[in-house]
Design a protein with these regions (language model features):
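Core alpha/beta catalytic barrel or barrel-like domain that forms the active/cofactor pocket
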Residues: 148-159, 166, 196-216, 246-262, ...
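ATP/Mg2+-dependent ligation/transfer catalytic cores
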Residues: 3-202, 224-227, 383, 391
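Short, hydrophobic beta-strand segments
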Residues: 113-119, 212-218, 265
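Catalytic-core signal marking the mid-to-C-terminal active-site face
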Residues: 5-13, 18-25, 230, 244-245, ...
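A generic structural motif
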Residues: 41-43, 118-124, 178, 218-224, ...
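Loop-centered beta-sheet repeat module
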Residues: 225-233, 238-249, 257-268
Length: 391
């Protein structure tokens, strides 16, 4: 357990010893009537079972049971071709992770937790996306690299179910009117995220009709992915409360701006968070030594990574040349058409990965990104020259 303890606080999740007692204590403190135990499948869909107060003790310890065959379901709930898990493949358990327990602001009396996944025997299950992410955090830690992650998500809000209603929305990019027209929803989102401990950087009207963007503050990778999924859930609920629908679909309408999910990666020295591994300490316009191999690793694995970052057919309707979304594998210092962008100067400098959308499972996307960074650092990969034109 020592390595995990030192690599990241969130890795303690996967040390099951004290988690049941911790879960129970927190549930009692919340005075919850029901607990929603949630895991996210490979399509990034939250799946859950609700348990009543009388079963809290048992579920805190044992978790809830799901059929392994659930992993074969696509985002449409159709079984994928050539499924890995048959009807005879048994069960897995979702055990509440106490560090993720929240009281749902829009559902009084309901507590919710994300999960550690185990097999029938209670041993950690190899297919758990959260555990796979923690393993890459530990790998980078051994290379002397610590990572902070911030998600930036776009979504569209449609009133009722009429897509034509979208086009009557006149709020322009960052327009005050756009923000004002939806402020009861915006205020609800900010209040609810604050209540569950998700730290927001900013919320704004985006380019497309009915389109908004929310940026979250940096956190360790596991926490950042947890927070994005919680934010997505609460944003959808806030829109529903206003009689509207919030959609994170990559390209919901052909002629309207698509929705991206950008990932910002900050790299520091594992033993000294004050040493930035992206920005050069002495030259604000230069990159630090580790940034080159990190970017090279991200580019080397970009094609494979797209299966994790933008996993739906709809994703590729967004990723077109000339669309401000990355259609090619490239990197640049400021260019917003590049796949890997290096925004910021000095201490604020970091890596922004622009290819993804909310059809992803963010744990798997981050697992792939961190593995690519680790590969670049381990192999001392050389970074190609930056692209400075709109690609």
């Amino acid at each position: 357990g020592h390595v995990m303890q030192t690599a990241t606080g969130s890795a303690r999740t996967f040390e099951a010893r004290d988690s049941a007692a911790d879960t129970l204590a927190r549930l009692r403190g919340m005075d919850a009537d029901a607990l929603w135990v949630v895991y996210h499948d490979y399509a990034g869909l939250g799946r859950a079972k609700a348990v009543p107060r009388g079963r809290f003790e048992e579920v805190a310890r044992e978790g809830v049971t799901f059929a392994m065959a659930n992993w074969d379901l696509a985002i449409t709930d159709e079984q994928v071709p050539h499924p890995i898990f048959g009807a005879d493949s048994g069960d897995f358990r979702a055990v509440p992770d106490p560090s993720t327990l929240v009281a749902l602001p829009h559902r009084p009396g309901v507590a919710q937790a994300f999960s550690r996944l185990t097999d029938d025997t209670g041993a950690a299950w190899v297919g758990d996306p959260r555990a796979r992410l923690v393993a890459q955090v530990v790998r980078l830690d051994a290379l002397g690299v610590a990572v902070k992650v911030a998600f930036e998500a776009e979504f569209v809000v449609v009133q009722g179910t009429d897509p034509e209603a979208l086009h009557s929305d006149l709020g322009r990019m960052f327009a005050v009117e756009g923000l004002d027209g939806r402020w009861s929803m915006g205020a609800r989102i900010l209040d609810d995220l604050d209540a569950v401990g998700v730290a927001v950087h900013q919320f704004a009207k985006e380019y497309g009709p009915g389109q908004f963007e929310i940026s979250l503050l940096p956190a360790d990778p596991l926490r950042a992915a947890d927070h994005f999924l919680l934010a997505r859930q609460l944003i959808r609920a806030a829109a529903r409360a206003e009689g509207a629908t919030a959609s994170f679909m990559p390209k919901p309408f052909a002629d309207v701006a698509g929705n991206g999910l950008h990932v910002h990666l900050g790299l520091t020295r594992a033993d000294d968070p004050n040493v930035d591994l992206v920005a050069d300490r002495d030259d604000a316009s230069a990159l630090a030594e580790t940034a080159g191999p990190a970017i090279a690793g991200l580019l080397a694995h970009a094609a494979g990574q797209s299966a994790l970052a933008s996993p739906t057919a709809n994703s590729y309707k967004r990723l077109l040349p000339g669309s401000w979304a990355p259609a090619h594998v490239s990197w640049a210092i400021g260019n917003r058409a590049a796949l890997i962008r290096v925004p910021g100067r000095g201490a604020g400098r970091h890596l922004e990965v622009r290819g993804g959308d909310a059809g992803m499972n963010p744990y798997l996307h981050l697992t792939g990104l961190l593995a690519a960074v680790a590969d670049g650092v381990e192999k001392h990969l050389a970074v190609p020259p930056p692209a400075e034109v709109d690609v």
